[in-house]
Every structure is written in C-alpha cells, then in structure tokens.
C-alpha cells in the first residue's frame, strides 16, 4: 500500500502537555484525540497507547515520549506527552521535542504543585513562547470558589515566571469524563482546543529570521577565493550581501560573491539549505569550523553564560565519576568543540551542591576560552575526549 502524502493545507504547530505528575496530562491527551476523532480530525488513542510510549534515544539519552497528531479546523498539531518527570526535563533540555506552545495541566483538586512550578520555569528557560492552562479534574470539585482560588494561584504563579498570567486562558476540563463520552465535558475539550488555536501563535518560520550559518568546512578554489560550507540555520542570504564572520577570533565583514548548492549556482540560499558560500577577500586561514556567518550586526560573540544541564548517567555513556567546580570540558556548540570551564553550579532547584554526579541536573555558569556565537535558548553538549557527557541549554548570557 502506498504511503499517504502529508497534506500541507493547514499550518503545523508543535505542542505538548506539561504539569505535575498525576494531574492528568496523559488522560487529557487521550481525551483530545478521542473528542477530535469524532469529527474525523484525529485517530482516537487510549491512555495505554500514550502511557506505554517507547523509549527514544536522542543524542544517546534515553527518553520516553509519546507523539500523537491531530487537527482542529484551523491547524495540524503534533503533540508530545512524556510519562515521567525526568523524561520531560531531558526532553526540554535536549530539544528532542521543540515546542511552539504547551498545555499546562493542573488539577483543580490539588492546585499548583512542585513540578507545576518546575515545568513553567523550564518552559520559560527553553523558550516555549506561549501556554494555555487546562484546569483538570473539575468534575471532582463542587465548590466554584475553590476553582476560582486555584485559578488565581495559577495566574500568580505564571506572572512570577514572566508569563502573562492575566491573559493566559484557563479552561476548566475533565479529561476522564470527556474520555467516558460525557458530552458536557467533551465540549470543554473543544473549548480548550479553540483556546490553543487562538493563544498559541503560529511559529515564526526560520526563513523570516536574520541569516545565520554555522561553518562546517572551508576550502579554497584557485582563482575564485574561499568557500565556507554548512547548513543555513535561519534566514536567507543573497549573492552580493554583506555578512559577518563571528566567533573564535575578532568579528570581520565580508561579501558573499556566490552561493552554491549541489554544484549549482543559486541567487540566494535559505533556511535548511546545505550550501557553499564564496567569500570575498577572505583567506582560507581566516575562517574555520565553529565560526558562524551572520547577517551584519545581528549577533555578538560571548564567553560567559548560564545553562541548565543534564549530566548523563554511566549507562547512557556518561562519566563514571563526579566532577567539581573548575571542571574543564569541551562545550560542543553548533559545529565545534570549544574548551571552557564550569566555574560554578547549583542543583536544579538552586540548592548548593559540592559536586555533580552522573545523572544529575544542574544550573551552571560556564566560561569559554574564546568568544563564540551563543544565544539564549540554544542547545549545547558537554564533551570529554569526543564523547558526550552532558546536554544543556543556554538560559542566560552573562558577557
């Protein structure tokens, strides 16, 4: 049987469910697919299908993630749900599932709990742009005042992490009742999806952002000059445009005199293209792997940053022993290893710790020996002699 073609007739958005353990994320995910399946916009999945998600390996880290897809009248969604708390954290830090927005699930019976807060913070740090709240298990709370109090508490919590608490929609739902086919609660799931359609913005396409290409290889063509190759991460670049070479050494300006892809000449290269860019007046030794070519003035190199890091366990190929402040690994950023130092760290909840064990999650301050184009929300790996021992995301640029 021939595979059916993916129809691109609606905008595609990646979302996920986040929130405290046992607040009903997986049940709600199942309910969404069941309610939309009745309109022919999804394949109905039950709790077991989603909860029994197979393990995935992303950069050598084992993550349990369930992927479901469904449509609303407006959009096509890919939705991730992770059964375990540790899986969420790994997922968000490694970028295994990039989210354009998330449904924060909070049980009306409990109100916000520890992981509710932690997931909101993580969403902020890894750059999830928008949230919608599903206040779940509302069928179990008779008192309207309790629900109002929980809503206020959630809004204050969102505000404290710089999300617009007053504007984020909070929809009262019961994933379980909707799954059982109760029509009142089914309509609440539809209301939730209408809020998701309206409040989670369509992602800005990479092509509309300022040009950036990480240099993977450099060679010189006799009589023509120096060519840098790589995959364009975002934006587009035209022949004749000025670009900056950023990172490792002082930033310098050059002009793109040719764009080639698969040995063919192009007028412009765009996000996703693997290209060779011919650069005017640049010697082969002036540019190396690990530098980036960017739209003039769009990015500055940095050496000091804060990051959220997951340190691999021994079984995941990580270290067998702990490390201490002052540890000097390589940071693999975009296309190259840069030596640096982890000057300070705390546990992920801010508690002071003396050492970092394999399997830990930490907040760290890193300092690189030379400036590189690092940006907030960017992923990096921590390596030692060529093997990955940690995965992280830049939460803040210091200098």
From Swiss-Prot:
GTP binds at residues 19-26, 81-85, 136-139. Mg(2+) binds at residue 26. The keyword Coiled coil does not apply. It comes from Prochlorococcus marinus subsp. pastoris (strain CCMP1986 / NIES-2087 / MED4). GO terms for cellular component: cytosol. Coiled coil: none annotated. PANTHER family: ELONGATION FACTOR TU, MITOCHONDRIAL, ELONGATION FACTOR TU-RELATED. Monomer. Residues 81-84 are annotated as: G3. It is found in: Cytoplasm. Its main location: cytoplasm. Its EC number is 3.6.5.3. GTP hydrolase that promotes the GTP-dependent binding of aminoacyl-tRNA to the A-site of ribosomes during protein biosynthesis. Residues 174-176 are annotated as: G5. Residues 10-204 form the tr-type G domain. One of its GO terms (molecular function) is GTPase activity. It catalyses: GTP + H2O = GDP + phosphate + H(+). Residues 19-26 are annotated as: G1. Residues 60-64 are annotated as: G2. InterPro entries: EF-Tu_GTP-bd (IPR041709), EF-Tu_GTPase (IPR050055), EFTu-like_2 (IPR004161), EFTU_2 (IPR033720), G_TR_CS (IPR031157), P-loop_NTPase (IPR027417), Small_GTP-bd (IPR005225), T_Tr_GTP-bd_dom (IPR000795). Gene3D superfamilies: P-loop containing nucleotide triphosphate hydrolases, Translation factors. Belongs to the TRAFAC class translation factor GTPase superfamily. Classic translation factor GTPase family. EF-Tu/EF-1A subfamily. Keywords: Cytoplasm, Elongation factor, GTP-binding, Hydrolase, Magnesium, Metal-binding, Nucleotide-binding, Protein biosynthesis. Residues 136-139 are annotated as: G4. This is Elongation factor Tu.
């Amino acid at each position: 049987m021939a595979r059916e073609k993916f129809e691109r007739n609606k905008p595609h958005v990646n979302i996920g469910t986040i929130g405290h353990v046992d607040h009903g994320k997986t049940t709600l995910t199942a309910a969404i697919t069941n309610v939309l399946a009745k309109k022919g916009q999804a394949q109905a999945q039950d709790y077991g299908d989603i909860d029994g998600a197979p393990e995935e390996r992303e950069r050598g880290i084992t993550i349990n993630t369930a992927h479901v897809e469904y449509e609303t009248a407006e959009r096509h969604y890919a939705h991730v749900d992770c059964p375990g708390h540790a899986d969420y954290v790994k997922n968000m830090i490694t970028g295994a599932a990039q989210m354009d927005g998330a449904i924060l699930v909070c049980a009306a019976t409990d109100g916000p709990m520890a992981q509710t807060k932690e997931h909101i913070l993580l969403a902020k740090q890894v750059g999830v742009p928008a949230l919608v709240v599903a206040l779940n298990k509302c069928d179990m709370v008779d008192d309207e005042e309790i629900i109002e109090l929980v809503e206020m508490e959630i809004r204050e919590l969102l505000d404290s992490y710089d999300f617009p608490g007053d504007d984020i929609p909070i929809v009262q739902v019961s994933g379980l009742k909707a799954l059982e086919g109760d029509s009142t609660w089914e309509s609440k799931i539809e209301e939730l999806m209408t809020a998701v359609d309206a409040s989670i913005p369509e992602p800005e396409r990479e092509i509309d952002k300022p040009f950036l290409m990480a240099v993977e290889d450099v060679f010189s063509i006799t009589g023509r000059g120096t060519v840098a190759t790589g995959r364009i991460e975002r934006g587009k670049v035209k022949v004749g445009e000025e670009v900056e070479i950023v990172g490792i050494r002082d930033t310098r300006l050059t002009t793109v005199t040719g764009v080639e892809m698969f040995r063919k000449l192009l007028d412009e290269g765009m996000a996703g293209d693997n290209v060779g860019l011919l650069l005017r007046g640049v010697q082969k030794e002036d540019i190396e792997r690990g530098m980036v070519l960017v739209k003039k003035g769009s990015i500055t190199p940095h050496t000091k940053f804060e990051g959220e890091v997951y340190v691999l366990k021994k079984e995941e190929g990580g270290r067998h022993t702990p490390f201490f402040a002052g540890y000097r690994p390589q940071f693999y950023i975009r296309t190259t290893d840069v030596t640096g130092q982890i000057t300070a760290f705390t546990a992920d909840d801010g508690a002071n710790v003396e050492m970092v064990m394999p399997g830990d999650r930490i907040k760290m301050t890193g300092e690189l020996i030379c400036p590189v184009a690092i940006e907030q929300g960017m992923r990096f790996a921590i390596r030692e002699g060529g093997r990955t021992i940690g995965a992280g995301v830049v939460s803040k640029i210091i200098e």
